[in-house]
Amino acid sequence: MDDSTHTCQYNEEDGSMRMYIRGRPVVLYGPSDHDTLDPAKVAPPPQSKLKLEWVYGYRGKDCRSNLYLLPTGEIVYFVAAVVVLFNVDEQCQRHYTGHTDDVKCIAIHPNKMIIASGQCAGHDRLDARPHIRVWNSVSLATLAVLGSGHIERAVACLTFSRADGGSLLAAVDEGPDHTISVWEWQRPDKGHCVAETKCSVDTVVAAEFHPLDRNQIVTCGKGHIAFWTLDASNVLYKRMGIFETRDKPKYVTCLGFNHNGDVISGDSNGNLIVWGRGTNTIQKMVRGVHSGSVFSVCSLKEGAVVSGGGKDGRLVLFDADLQPTATENVIEGHYGGVRVIAEGRGSQLFIGTTKNCILHGDMELGFLPAVLGHVDEVWGLAANPALPQFVSGCWDSLLQLWDPLSHSTVWSKDIGERAQSCAWSSDGSVIAVGCVSGKWLVFDPVSREMVAHHVDGVEPIQTIQYSPDNKYVAIGSRDNFIYIYQVDDNCSRYSRLGKCLGHSSFITHLDWSEDSQYIRSNSGDYELLYWNATTCRQITSPTSMRDVVWASNNCPITFQTIGVWPENADGTDINTCTRSHDNRLAATGDDFGKVKLFAYPVTQPKSLCHQYGGHSSHVTCVRFLLDDSRLVTAGGLDTSLMQWVVE
């Protein structure tokens, strides 16, 4: 395919623009009163900009050591490519956005102000290398960028030295040798790697500098715990922990230290083991603390120790000698198991869970959620047309209603089906959810009860949209059909009018006309087709539709969105498109984690935009809230939702 994929050709005679997506020509007709276009002209970006206001979600499903409390009262954690600093008491967030792809680990400097975070390889060719960023948590200024070109695949673990005041930073990567490297991160020459060696052929899940002994590092993972020494000539050597005849675990899953400087490890057998300071031998074993793996062991200020079960969800309190106390707690199963325990103020604890929630509370009174997240791909997103609310639907079967002003979950419901798409009725009275199975369900947002249930085909329902007059709903399926239903009885009764046949690929997006008579739709092979909604017939003359006023612009392939397509677009670039209710802005989400903001209409093939990172996966849906004050974006596989203020 030549480089002229997106060379648009404008035909002055009929006011049409021919553009190519993946070599396929698409002819788009402008309104009859549209001024003649000069395709060479460059449209400026909008005056409005986006500012990241809130990030919903937390990555506890598959990452460890990812939750800490700072002296500012903020908890620090990550999701997607953002490190979040969240003050739970004051309900405010700040964000470190220096990363270009998934953040996989963080470490806190002994001064409790400096943070290191490590990422995986990125989409951007320039920033494709996995690397470590060291930054100031007060100013959010980046202090050092380390390891680009050294680190393979991703940074798995990070730890600052503690006995010497944090001059060294150790990292373990996710390459085949799980290389451990030690960095003098403050060196002016972008940090200096002082030592590097193979750590283990097996997975490494945790690494910690010893809090009292200089140049001692402990790592653990599949079938091993290793005690490392960095000697005077900067050579790393290790002694493996000796399990002797005792039942060697499949995984050593977490590390901690007691006040004497002994190492405490938790493992997949549910045991806690104390390794005497400076040795590689077992001093004490507490068996069967948890059924299933111990995912976190946390030493508290007064010397007590809390362990958390990844499977059983139990939190067990021990005294300083690792004798069990009578105190334990269990977190509710729907929040997941315990991923990490972080000590808060006083007796307070923060708990990160395996279902991407963060809970806070104490062992006596129990725990409440501070962060609720999705745990699988998020595709469904829709803004309430009547109230400042939005709803998200996910492959984890959760439907969640959010209040963007208080940044809180109004409710979360397990609908028993993997959700693919969401829509509100035009009056905001119901929420329709398209599912992966071909089912689509309708819910009352106040009672949360299901009011209707239908099935169309066995493929995912990719998009669902009510007509502006609320009399119809259109359901676009992966089976290439659009199903049209008549809507009665306050959106609780649905009767099928028919299905629209004509697309040769799956339906991706659709819009209704303002008068509720017509539908336009895009498909997986980049078609734009028009339909008479009540007859379900295709309108084969696109010129007859050029002056129709559309109630939305969710279809990215339209005359009004020509300029959102980049040069050499291969069609998979843009997953989602929307326009603001005042018709001044268009927003898109792409396969590279980018959210873009354009001035609407985007009719110039060369249109400049403002571009924003934060998501690390494909951005699956973007929607403006009803007053256009904010844009909400869904991050697909990164499981996050992000809320941006339009400034």
Task: Please place each PLM-identified region on the residue numbering.
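WD40-repeat beta-propeller superdomains and closely related acidic/aromatic-rich repeat-like regions
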Residues: 2-647
